[in-house]
UniProtKB/Swiss-Prot annotation:
<dbReference type="InterPro" id="IPR020818">
    <property type="entry name" value="Chaperonin_GroES"/>
</dbReference>
<protein>
    <recommendedName>
        <fullName>Co-chaperonin GroES</fullName>
    </recommendedName>
</protein>
<dbReference type="GO" id="GO:0044183">
    <property type="term" value="F:protein folding chaperone"/>
</dbReference>
<dbReference type="GO" id="GO:0046872">
    <property type="term" value="F:metal ion binding"/>
</dbReference>
<comment type="function">
    <text>Together with the chaperonin GroEL, plays an essential role in assisting protein folding. The GroEL-GroES system forms a nano-cage that allows encapsulation of the non-native substrate proteins and provides a physical environment optimized to promote and accelerate protein folding. GroES binds to the apical surface of the GroEL ring, thereby capping the opening of the GroEL channel.</text>
</comment>
<dbReference type="InterPro" id="IPR018369">
    <property type="entry name" value="Chaprnonin_Cpn10_CS"/>
</dbReference>
<dbReference type="InterPro" id="IPR037124">
    <property type="entry name" value="Chaperonin_GroES_sf"/>
</dbReference>
<keyword id="KW-0963">Cytoplasm</keyword>
<dbReference type="GO" id="GO:0051087">
    <property type="term" value="F:protein-folding chaperone binding"/>
</dbReference>
<comment type="subunit">
    <text>Heptamer of 7 subunits arranged in a ring. Interacts with the chaperonin GroEL.</text>
</comment>
<comment type="similarity">
    <text>Belongs to the GroES chaperonin family.</text>
</comment>
<keyword id="KW-0143">Chaperone</keyword>
<dbReference type="GO" id="GO:0005737">
    <property type="term" value="C:cytoplasm"/>
</dbReference>
<dbReference type="InterPro" id="IPR011032">
    <property type="entry name" value="GroES-like_sf"/>
</dbReference>
<dbReference type="GO" id="GO:0005524">
    <property type="term" value="F:ATP binding"/>
</dbReference>
<dbReference type="GO" id="GO:0051085">
    <property type="term" value="P:chaperone cofactor-dependent protein refolding"/>
</dbReference>
<dbReference type="Pfam" id="PF00166">
    <property type="entry name" value="Cpn10"/>
</dbReference>
Length: 95
């Protein structure tokens, strides 16, 4: 099933964090924080100004992004957990 976000919303797949520390310690699932890094799966067309003019999206499908800890709404699609968020919830694009 495909899902196309509307307006300035973005569908994001979380990128899992490392399972080991730099020193080689394995981090148990219970101690891991939810990752705040992800990959853009799909984007809406953008927001609209009061005049009706389209404001194009800054991010695009495939971009690797950084977002706030509490950003977005969790969505399950075909058994995969994704996040739906507004473009303004994105802190930056990782290059």
């Amino acid at each position: 099933m495909a899902l196309k976000p509307l307006q300035d919303r973005v569908l994001v797949r979380r990128v899992e964090s490392e399972e080991k520390t730099a020193g080689g310690l394995i981090i148990p699932e219970s101690a891991k924080e939810k990752p705040s890094e992800g990959e853009v799966v799909s984007c809406g067309d953008g927001a609209r100004k009061d005049s009706g003019e389209l404001i194009e999206m800054t991010v695009k499908t495939g971009d690797r992004i950084l977002f706030g800890k509490w950003s977005g709404t969790e969505v399950t699609l075909d058994g995969e957990e994704l996040l739906m968020m507004k473009e303004s919830d994105i802190l930056g694009i990782i290059t």
